[in-house]
Amino acid sequence: MKLVIVSGRSGSGKSVALRVLEDLGYYCVDNLPLQLIGPLLAQLKGNNDKVAISIDIRNMPEQEKALEKELARLPEGVELTSFFLNSSDKVLLKRYSETRRLHPLSRSKVSLQEAIKLEGKMLAPISNMVDHFIDTSNLNVYELADAVRQILLGRTDKELVIIFESFGFKHGMPTEADFMFDARFLPNPHWEPELRPLTGLDEPVKLFLERQVLVNKYIWQIENLLETWLPHLERNNRSYLTIAIGCTGGQHRSVYIAEQLAKRFANSHHKVEARHRELNAKA
């Protein structure tokens, strides 16, 4: 089992790091009390082999001793990686002033500036215990995400999951689509009696549609559009891209086009899935 512990000063980017870990398949728990680390790992054993937790000033008193104690009690076979995120007092003060959020130690009736300094002193022992220290003072959220991925994966690029989803307009449009293409103007196998009961997954329907010049041109143009803009979408730090293809009933044309696009992009470095909403609904 892999365990990642993320600690750091409030406002330094722990929530960003946790989101990156979640995108990488980690089971993430924010602000977990230290004494619950062992029970959590025991409960997840066999179901989740990658776990990430964040700990901060709110978790425990006497942090250095408590953390050392809990880490010493980790089960055998746990591969531990730890991060500490830090920013300068000036940057943290600016971030809190901009967001108007309450610092965890501000409840102690101290000023924001005093709370930031106090937290830095209290967390200093932990910052010396971790594997990786990241100063986020001059990093934006994308650069911080890249830094975390670089440490864990040895590379900064994240795996973009591309989903090609077929659907029928008469059953409603999907709400989660990033791109949507209408295939209702293309030649329709529905009007061929022998093809009507079949789907875009069946060979006779495939043969019918692959002979249509308009269908091939439409697929090529969608492919060209996506290839042009994919690098820009990846740089936007997204995890999923859903391309919806719709025809009237979601049985023939949209299914065929979604399958063809999935095959063409399967050779790229992305993870590609083809989903067929109406066919799955009938299954």
UniProtKB/Swiss-Prot annotation:
<keyword id="KW-0067">ATP-binding</keyword>
<dbReference type="InterPro" id="IPR053930">
    <property type="entry name" value="RapZ-like_N"/>
</dbReference>
<keyword id="KW-0342">GTP-binding</keyword>
<comment type="function">
    <text>Displays ATPase and GTPase activities.</text>
</comment>
<feature type="binding site">
    <location>
        <begin position="56"/>
        <end position="59"/>
    </location>
    <ligand>
        <name>GTP</name>
    </ligand>
</feature>
<dbReference type="Pfam" id="PF03668">
    <property type="entry name" value="RapZ-like_N"/>
</dbReference>
<dbReference type="GO" id="GO:0005524">
    <property type="term" value="F:ATP binding"/>
</dbReference>
<dbReference type="Pfam" id="PF22740">
    <property type="entry name" value="PapZ_C"/>
</dbReference>
<dbReference type="InterPro" id="IPR027417">
    <property type="entry name" value="P-loop_NTPase"/>
</dbReference>
<feature type="binding site">
    <location>
        <begin position="8"/>
        <end position="15"/>
    </location>
    <ligand>
        <name>ATP</name>
    </ligand>
</feature>
<keyword id="KW-0547">Nucleotide-binding</keyword>
<dbReference type="GO" id="GO:0005525">
    <property type="term" value="F:GTP binding"/>
</dbReference>
<comment type="similarity">
    <text>Belongs to the RapZ-like family.</text>
</comment>
<dbReference type="InterPro" id="IPR005337">
    <property type="entry name" value="RapZ-like"/>
</dbReference>
<protein>
    <recommendedName>
        <fullName>Nucleotide-binding protein Sama_3091</fullName>
    </recommendedName>
</protein>
<dbReference type="InterPro" id="IPR053931">
    <property type="entry name" value="RapZ_C"/>
</dbReference>
